[in-house]
């Protein structure tokens, strides 16, 4: 009987931290699901994309609204960096002048997108208290500017010779992840907590 009580006590002690951790993680996990439901607006593939994209960062389960937006922006920045690297590889091998011009225009757009997304992530991370509204507006503006980068890249290829962009899939991916970041971006700064 004493062994059974001791075993029960050990089980209880092991269970308490797990239950406490679950209670702390649940609201943020719910926030992740709530934000993805709003983003998807009833479209299951969009919801799955949102969850899959944000869960790439293991901190997403415990993140607040601002943290989720910053994660989405960092993921968008990584997408833009990868596309910029692809553009650089294509530029090295391109011999047709019109396509080189198109790639040069795309390189400029994606370099600007990388800078803007970096600034947007910093703005969201700093958006606390009364001054935070300005940072959130700036982040929204930067995300809106980045949303146009893929289309400008496509237009550059059309102008350069009427050929389609070799970056269509990458362009669509950037627009989708920037759209996700825009949709989950908080509209108001978080209140600052006093120590």
Language-model features and meaning:
Residues 2-140, 145-195:
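Trafficking entry modules
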């Amino acid at each position: 009987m004493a062994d059974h009580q001791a075993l029960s006590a050990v089980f209880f002690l092991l269970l308490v931290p797990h239950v406490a951790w679950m209670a702390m993680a649940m609201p943020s996990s719910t926030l992740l699901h709530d934000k993805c439901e709003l983003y998807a607006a009833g479209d299951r593939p969009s919801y799955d994309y949102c969850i899959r994209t944000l869960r790439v960062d293991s901190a997403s389960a415990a993140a607040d609204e601002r943290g989720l937006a910053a994660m989405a922006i960092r993921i968008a920045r990584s997408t833009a960096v990868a596309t910029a690297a692809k553009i650089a590889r294509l530029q090295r091998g391109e011999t047709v002048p019109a396509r080189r011009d198109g790639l040069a225009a795309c390189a400029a757009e994606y370099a600007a997108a990388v800078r803007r997304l970096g600034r947007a992530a910093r703005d969201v991370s700093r958006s606390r208290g009364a001054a935070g509204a300005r940072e959130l507006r700036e982040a929204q503006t930067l995300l809106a500017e980045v949303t146009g980068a893929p289309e400008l890249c496509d237009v550059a290829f059309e102008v350069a010779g009427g050929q389609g962009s070799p970056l269509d899939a990458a362009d669509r991916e950037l627009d989708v992840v920037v759209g996700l970041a825009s949709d989950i971006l908080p509209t108001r700064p978080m209140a600052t907590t006093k120590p």
